[in-house]
Curated annotation (Swiss-Prot):
GO terms for biological process: arginine biosynthetic process via ornithine; L-arginine biosynthetic process. GO terms for molecular function: argininosuccinate lyase activity. Pathway: Amino-acid biosynthesis; L-arginine biosynthesis; L-arginine from L-ornithine and carbamoyl phosphate: step 3/3. It is an enzyme of class 4 (lyase). The keyword Cytoplasm applies. Coiled coil: none annotated. It catalyses: 2-(N(omega)-L-arginino)succinate = fumarate + L-arginine. It comes from Actinobacillus pleuropneumoniae serotype 7 (strain AP76). This is Argininosuccinate lyase. It holds the Pfam family Lyase_1.
Amino acid sequence: MALWGGRFKQEADAKFKFFNDSLRFDYRLALQDIDGSIGWAKAITSVGILTEQEHQQLVVALKELRAEIEPNIAIILRDDAEDIHSWVESKLIEKVGDLGKKLHTGRSRNDQVAVDMKMWCKVQAVVLQERIRNLQHKLVETAEANQNAVMPGYTHLQRAQPITFAHWCMAYYEMLERDFSRLSDAYKRMHTCPLGSGALAGTAYSIDRDALAQDLGFSIGTRNSLDSVSDRDHVLELLSTASISMVHLSRFAEDLIFFNSGESAFLELSDRVTSGSSLMPQKKNPDACELIRGKSGRVFGALSGLLTTLKGLPLAYNKDMQEDKEGIFDAMETWQACLEIGALVLEDINVNVERTREAAQQGYSNATELADYLVAKGIPFREAHHIVGEAVVYAISKREPLEALSVAEFKQFHPVIDEDVYPILSLESCLEKRSAKGGVNPERVREAIEAAKVNLGA
């Protein structure tokens, strides 16, 4: 039976009922709905709506219901209730009879769903931080194992300067650290409890909303009932953080796809995270990484969709807000899966250090070192930049790397260039010179790895 049937003389059309009902997706809020109901039972007992005996009966029944569904909440989908609130109430009435009908006193589904969603978002934030930490651990482990893997760094997808695979890993560690921080910030703003706001104007019963908030794991009750039932900022913040993180994961995946390709051959992905072709027997496709890259779009879409849904809504609750759920449920599941698969990809990754070094020695990625060499000889950088550009053009014409040019050839471009130029053109010198904080100098990279391990508690 619908929770609102008294006003209506006709049954809802079956098509409208399916269109309107939300149990098929909001069943995911079952545990939060039950926990919120336990908290609400205590609150209305404190103002005399329930006796202590009735309160205990309801709590026992609600806890029984929670225990029944917790192993597999999808069993709820066998029923045909309008939404998760209706389902919980109907099951409660089955257990305790008419007493179950008293629980909703002073409460609206508007503040009920608001608290359910916020509680669910809090759980998700914690779970996702755990998944981020796991991927960060894998990145640090991979970095530590590949500190000597010199490879080209890229700008515009052209070889730019030598880096190490460890430095590359730590770049993504830093991106994920910001994602972790954004979740922490979002979580702080989830500390207020909307339950007790009623439909929009507040509850008619003088419950202690701050005590209720603390019972449900919040810090304090919200300050404005109208805002409380209308607020979905916590959903938007999670979707925004997920979208930014999926940008990072997509770039991570794209880099690995490129490094794994036959054209680069910098590394090989494990058989455990790749698949074959139904036609071409030789193929080993980086499907795990391609799916991470591809799934970013659905997360971005969830954020865009909810922003569009909310932007024109008048206060307070509108049924449009039911559209907050499917997007966030899917986005959080997708984000979590991508973090988990990203960690799995790194478990058995095999870096070809000979190939990465060979590639780093190509593409004139030591040209900047030659410019810095000239600067050290007293030549202004802009002039040095031009001189080295000419030297690179000359080396390209000879199909030789810069370090293969003779001193006499170098002196065509400037007389200050001498025998001491060759040591600075080595890959090791290129790395060593980048010794400022955050640079690719091996010692700086080691320090970054150690700092990350401390941060992760490793």
